[in-house]
Structure formats: structure tokens, C-alpha cells
Amino acid sequence: MSQQTVHFVVMGVCGCGKTTAAQALQADFNSPYAEGDDFHTQANRDKMGAGIPLTDEDRYPWLRNLRDWMSEQSGKGERYSVVTCSALKRQYRDILREAEGEVVFIHLAPPHDVNLARMMARKGHYMKAEMLTSQEAILEELGADEAGVRIDNAGEPAEVEAEMLAWVKAQGFGG
């Protein structure tokens, strides 16, 4: 009997380190990886680039596309997949949980000042630092009934990755 796919969704506000952490997890598990930003429509990217926060209606097609990608990985028999997605609200996470398989959230949560400094240092990303406050305002923490962990990642990427991988393996995932 085959095991169901476990989808790790590395989540959090813009600039929190999702991509770096997800790539470390993907490398450790040698699993398929999807950068959530790649699933946004050009209209969404333009809107965010102009400093205009996305509405729920803007996000729903994006979330459904990510969910469908996750289900495709299950259909291929993958043991694990890794996805980056802000997943700011529970209702957004509910859409992702509709994917075939088990969905586990890894919420990266640096302090505001650390996150802002990281965003200011980024070059060439469509998401501007001004968007951080709007995302923080709507962020809903993981509920006690949601599979996942919150990592306060104020440290260096290697420290955050080590904490994340230790938690994932402590849950019984991985080799």
C-alpha cells in the first residue's frame, strides 16, 4: 500500500525567508518544489508591484492552482512536495488542505524589523517592502487544529533551516 503524499507549505508574510527555507527542505527530501510566486497571474504581480494589496478574490485562483499542483504530485506518487505560499488566512490554508495527501504548514515568523530589513535588501522582486504591513495585518496564526509549526526566524538562514528540518524529522517525516 502506498503512503499518501505529504505537502510541506512554507508560509508567512513577504520577505520572511520562505524560498530559502523551502529550497533547503526540497534539497533534503529530494522532492518536487513549487515557488508559489510563480503561480500568480501577471495582473496579481502588477498589482503587488504597484503596492496594492491583493483581495481574497485575487488570491483564490492562485491558491487553487497551488492546490492542484500539490494534488498532481500526489497523483504521480511523490512521497513529499514542498511549496511556498504566504497562506496568510485560515480560509486560504483550507483551500490548500483540499489537495490530495497530507498538508503540513511551516510558518516562518521573523520580527517585523528583521523582516523589513530583509525586504529592503532584496533587489528585483515585484513585492515591495510597503506590502509587509498589509500582510501582517491580515495574517492569522495557525490554529491548534492545523498541522504545522511556527518558527520565529530572526536568525541566519542556516539556523532557521536547521530548526525547521529538526522539527520535520521529529514529526516522523523523512528518511
Task: Kindly label every feature range from the protein language model.
Residues 10:
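Hydrophobic anchor at the beta1->P-loop junction of P-loop NTPases
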Residues 16:
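ATP-binding Walker
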Residues 19:
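Walker A/P-loop
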Residues 13:
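P-loop (Walker A) phosphate-binding loop of NTP-binding proteins
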Residues 99-119:
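Conserved phosphate-donor/acceptor-positioning beta-strand/loop module used by diverse small-molecule
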Residues 23-68:
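Conserved substrate/cofactor phosphate-moiety recognition/catalytic segment
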Residues 57-100, 108:
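Glycine-rich phosphate-binding loop used to anchor ATP phosphates in small-molecule kinases
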Residues 121-164, 171:
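Small-molecule kinase domains that catalyze NTP-dependent phosphoryl transfer to phosphate-bearing small molecules
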